[in-house]
């Protein structure tokens, strides 16, 4: 997925990080899993979206990608 395919909030954050306005998160995969976990465990979020977040987090945990 390319940044231009993402929602406006992600594109804004991307531009802020790229410009140095916002700090880069060095542990990006762990931060992503924490965010997905928050979505997956929030009962206010629709069940289908919670399941998508859980699946995405599980895939990251199983993958061989690791934070540097």
From Swiss-Prot:
Listed Pfam families: UPF0253 (PF06786)
Transmembrane feature ranges: none
Superkingdom per UniProt: Bacteria
NCBIfam families referenced in this protein's UniProt entry, alphabetically: PRK04964.1
HAMAP family hit by this protein: UPF0253
Family to which this protein belongs: Belongs to the UPF0253 family.
UniProt-recorded name of the protein: UPF0253 protein ASA_2184
Species the sequence originates in: Aeromonas salmonicida (strain A449)
Taxonomic classification: Bacteria, Pseudomonadati, Pseudomonadota, Gammaproteobacteria, Aeromonadales
């Amino acid at each position: 997925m390319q940044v231009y395919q993402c929602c406006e909030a992600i594109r804004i954050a991307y531009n802020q990080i790229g410009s140095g306005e916002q700090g880069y998160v060095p542990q990006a995969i762990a931060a992503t899993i924490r965010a997905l976990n928050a979505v997956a465990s929030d009962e206010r979020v629709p069940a289908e979206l919670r399941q998508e977040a859980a699946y995405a987090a599980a895939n990251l945990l199983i993958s061989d990608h690791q934070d540097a």
